[in-house]
């Protein structure tokens, strides 16, 4: 796996919808993974011997148009969540500048620790509803997937969730990579 020839950020603009607005969600067991209400980090950890976060990049950057309305800059962190050396999830986090002013230390000190541990254990964050999206990767995300040597035979699925911290909200988007879909489908 070599992502060094690519450049951060890798994410792309995705249309997200409430699960009840999607005419056909993927079949089980993948559907349960997509809609799991708890920590995806914990769910992933329970299915491997070694869990690893590979940080692809983090910086103050402008979000995609419509991704985080009314924000000029956001702290954006992109990571791969790997199970036993295999990248399963591409995750993109957007933290508004105002939230960074009040909670900067929480985020900048993460390193290779999963953000899910902070969001679900600190008591400072309240998870919101899950939105889902189905899409075909293009541009940077497609190049990232190619560099991971993962072939996609299906459109990609992802989920997005807002987490409240006081009167601010951050966004976490998690895209299930092709290998994850293949391995989850085998769990049936």
Curated annotation (Swiss-Prot):
<dbReference type="GO" id="GO:0008813">
    <property type="term" value="F:chorismate lyase activity"/>
</dbReference>
<feature type="binding site">
    <location>
        <position position="115"/>
    </location>
    <ligand>
        <name>substrate</name>
    </ligand>
</feature>
<keyword id="KW-0670">Pyruvate</keyword>
<feature type="binding site">
    <location>
        <position position="174"/>
    </location>
    <ligand>
        <name>substrate</name>
    </ligand>
</feature>
<dbReference type="GO" id="GO:0006744">
    <property type="term" value="P:ubiquinone biosynthetic process"/>
</dbReference>
<dbReference type="GO" id="GO:0005829">
    <property type="term" value="C:cytosol"/>
</dbReference>
<feature type="binding site">
    <location>
        <position position="77"/>
    </location>
    <ligand>
        <name>substrate</name>
    </ligand>
</feature>
<dbReference type="InterPro" id="IPR007440">
    <property type="entry name" value="Chorismate--pyruvate_lyase"/>
</dbReference>
<keyword id="KW-0456">Lyase</keyword>
<dbReference type="Pfam" id="PF04345">
    <property type="entry name" value="Chor_lyase"/>
</dbReference>
<keyword id="KW-0963">Cytoplasm</keyword>
<comment type="similarity">
    <text>Belongs to the UbiC family.</text>
</comment>
<comment type="pathway">
    <text>Cofactor biosynthesis; ubiquinone biosynthesis.</text>
</comment>
<dbReference type="GO" id="GO:0042866">
    <property type="term" value="P:pyruvate biosynthetic process"/>
</dbReference>
<dbReference type="InterPro" id="IPR028978">
    <property type="entry name" value="Chorismate_lyase_/UTRA_dom_sf"/>
</dbReference>
<protein>
    <recommendedName>
        <fullName>Probable chorismate pyruvate-lyase</fullName>
        <ecNumber>4.1.3.40</ecNumber>
    </recommendedName>
</protein>
<comment type="function">
    <text>Removes the pyruvyl group from chorismate, with concomitant aromatization of the ring, to provide 4-hydroxybenzoate (4HB) for the ubiquinone pathway.</text>
</comment>
<keyword id="KW-0831">Ubiquinone biosynthesis</keyword>
